[in-house]
């Protein structure tokens, strides 16, 4: 088949495979367009779960007549115009493909009027070439989009739609999320002619909490702790439920927004979970509604087809900022009974780690000594960048927890180091460089073998085999246990009952290898792995390890370490001289027995004498 340009309708339907997953996806895209148009009231009418009708009506700025045809074309948008705009996106939409994709899998009608126009105009696309027809219509200032018979021309997609109730529940959840993101917009949701949800626009903080209670429920509002945290261009606001009173129902409330865009970001979720883990059970999850504001240049939103995920340029900074913000409000909640004391200004600025005391380290700029104020109480009700506690009336709290006396005593105790011992520590004997050495690396052969010279003999060493033995030695606990390295984002996997039982039996042996996990009803969460596995693709390796353990009747640390060493991916597809020398140095240090008695497949002598004799006889 020759290469050819796809027809517009087919190209749009392919794009719709990413944009239009179900009716809720259509609602999300269209409502976000209304928000970008500056609408303050949006009416959403749904029939038969969105399969028959989706109608979005707003009072936004509208679309000019001459731009209606472009609105239904692919890659046409008013949101961005250059690469600089793409790198600093502040609108919800920016790709210019939603309307074209939706119109290719439904009967879409767009009616709009701007304030400058005396009449409205209606546009719809049809046919193989998606030609747009525009005609006059009656309509107030704003836009109405009607999507009829979704997936009518793609029966395979329509067959995979769920029941009417299920699809509407997904739409309802999307509207809930949008209502939490935009308190200043009125949202009305109707299903089959009946008004189901009505979220009126609110302005004051007390009214915001009423909408929060209407969406998330009174139990969440009663346990909600308000947060306001700031550092430079980073701002964190919202509510987190008191972990001591978090229930299974509350744990379903996990909403986070980045610059007003609803997200499902693992980094943010991990930071919140880590801040709450001391007060949460192993099978519990935190409940929160949080809003992160960040410089648009520091976040990339163009990394997911449905824009559900983002990528931060300084992910570690964002993670620690959120972690500290949530941790501080939780500590303030539990430490308000500790006495406060005044502290005289220090003679010079010494940065200190005050995360554990609940102080916002990010919000404290470095101030020259000469510009410092006289001694004042650390606790200040109006300090910017602080964290709030529980609020019943409304308003963001600006209270910042101060220096705690008890924590100061602990801190001073930690500074008291024991006297140095005059007894010298025994020095480990150095390995005999001659007897415990593979020899000198001459060159790399075939990309994965090292040619060695030792005592006038030439040998060929398999670098992948040597690396496997080194990994096994690094994983096998010796006199000191293997150090577990916590994962920035824990790996959560679904397991069967048999796999879960095998993991429970093998847990002591895995712990010796530095693999730490927690399990609940149907899932296991890997929280730490040993250092040699940090750079591995754990989403592939761990399920394979679980499958291996499920097939075993008895467990031994050495056998598990050997299996892992054989199944990890090599970090060096092509070896260099420096990498080979470094590997052999580690093998000689950790596995001296391999030098004395090399196992099969590691070393192969090269017979130079026969080659030399052959040359002499020529």
UniProtKB/Swiss-Prot annotation:
UniProt source species: Salmonella arizonae (strain ATCC BAA-731 / CDC346-86 / RSK2980)
Gene Ontology MF annotations: ATP binding; ATP hydrolysis activity; ATP-dependent DNA damage sensor activity; mismatched DNA binding
SMART domains linked: DNA_mis_repair, MutL_C
InterPro entries (UniProt xref): DNA_mismatch_repair_CS, DNA_mismatch_repair_MutL, DNA_mismatch_S5_2-like, HATPase_C_sf, MutL/Mlh/PMS, MutL/Mlh/Pms-like, MutL_C, MutL_C_dimsub
Top-level taxonomic group: Bacteria
One of the record's GO cellular component terms: mismatch repair complex
Purpose of the protein: This protein is involved in the repair of mismatches in DNA. It is required for dam-dependent methyl-directed DNA mismatch repair. May act as a 'molecular matchmaker', a protein that promotes the formation of a stable complex between two or more DNA-binding proteins in an ATP-dependent manner without itself being part of a final effector complex.
Cysteines paired by S-S bonds: none
Protein name (database record): DNA mismatch repair protein MutL
GO biological process: mismatch repair
Similarity comment: Belongs to the DNA mismatch repair MutL/HexB family.
UniProt keyword list: DNA damage, DNA repair
Gly residues bias (residue ranges): 382-392
Location of the region described as Disordered in the Swiss-Prot/TrEMBL record: 371-401
């Amino acid at each position: 088949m020759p290469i050819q340009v796809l027809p517009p309708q087919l190209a749009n339907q392919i794009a719709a495979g990413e944009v239009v997953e179900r009716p809720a996806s259509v609602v999300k895209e269209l409502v976000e367009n209304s928000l970008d148009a500056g609408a303050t009231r949006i009416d959403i009418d749904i029939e038969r779960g969105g399969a028959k009708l989706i109608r979005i009506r707003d009072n936004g700025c509208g679309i000019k007549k001459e731009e209606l045809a472009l609105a239904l074309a692919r890659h046409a948008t008013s949101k961005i115009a250059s690469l600089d705009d793409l790198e600093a996106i502040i609108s919800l939409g920016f790709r210019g493909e939603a309307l074209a994709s939706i119109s290719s899998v439904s009967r879409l009608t767009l009616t709009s009027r701007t304030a400058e126009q005396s009449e409205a105009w209606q546009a719809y696309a049809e046919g193989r070439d998606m030609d747009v027809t525009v005609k006059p219509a009656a309509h107030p200032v704003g836009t109405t989009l009607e999507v009829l018979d979704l997936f009518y021309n793609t029966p395979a997609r329509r067959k995979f739609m769920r029941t009417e109730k299920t699809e509407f529940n997904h739409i309802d959840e999307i509207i809930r999320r949008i209502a939490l993101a935009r308190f200043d917009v009125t949202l009305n949701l109707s299903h089959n002619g009946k008004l189901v949800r009505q979220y009126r626009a609110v302005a004051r903080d007390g009214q915001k909490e009423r909408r929060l209670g209407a969406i998330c429920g009174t139990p969440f509002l009663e346990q909600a702790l308000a947060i306001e945290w700031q550092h430079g261009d980073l701002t964190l606001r919202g509510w987190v439920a008191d972990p001591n009173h978090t229930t299974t129902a509350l744990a379903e409330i996990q909403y986070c927004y980045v610059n007003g865009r609803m997200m499902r970001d693992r980094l943010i979720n991990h930071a919140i979970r880590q801040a709450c883990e001391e007060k949460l059970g192993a099978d519990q999850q935190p409940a929160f509604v949080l809003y992160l504001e960040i410089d648009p240049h520091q976040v990339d939103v163009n990394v997911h087809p449905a824009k559900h995920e983002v990528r931060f340029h300084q992910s570690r900074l964002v993670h620690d900022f959120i972690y500290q913000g949530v941790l501080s409000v939780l500590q303030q909640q539990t430490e308000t009974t500790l006495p406060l004391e005044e502290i005289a200004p220090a003679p010079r600025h010494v940065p200190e780690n005050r995360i554990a005391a609940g102080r916002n380290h990010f919000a404290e700029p470095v101030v020259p000594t000469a510009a410092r104020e006289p001694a004042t109480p650390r606790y200040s009700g109006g300090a910017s960048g602080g964290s709030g506690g529980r609020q019943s009336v409304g308003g963001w709290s600006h209270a910042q927890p101060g220096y705690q006396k008890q924590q100061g005593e602990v801190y001073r105790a930690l500074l008291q180091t024991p006297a140095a011992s005059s007894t010298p520590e025994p020095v480990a004997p150095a390995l005999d460089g001659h007897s415990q050495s593979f020899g000198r690396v001459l060159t790399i052969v075939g990309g994965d073998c090292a040619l060695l010279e030792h005592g006038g003999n030439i040998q060929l060493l398999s670098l992948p085999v040597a690396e496997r033995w080194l990994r096994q030695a690094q994983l096998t606990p010796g006199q000191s246990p293997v150090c577990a390295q916590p994962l920035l984002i824990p790996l959560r996997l679904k397991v069967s009952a048999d796999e879960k039982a095998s993991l429970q039996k093998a847990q002591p042996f895995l712990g010796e290898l530095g693999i730490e996990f927690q399990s609940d009803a149907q899932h296991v969460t890997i929280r730490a792995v040993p250092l040699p596995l940090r750079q591995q693709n754990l989403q592939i390796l761990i399920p394979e390890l679980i499958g291996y353990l499920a097939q075993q009747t008895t467990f031994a640390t050495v056998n598990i370490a050997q299996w892992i060493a054989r199944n990890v991916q090599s970090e060096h597809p092509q070896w260099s001289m420096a990498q080979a020398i470094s590997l052999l140095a580690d093998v000689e240090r950790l596995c001296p027995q391999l030098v004395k008695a090399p196992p099969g497949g590691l070393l192969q002598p090269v017979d130079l004498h026969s080659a030399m004799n052959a040359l002499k006889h020529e």
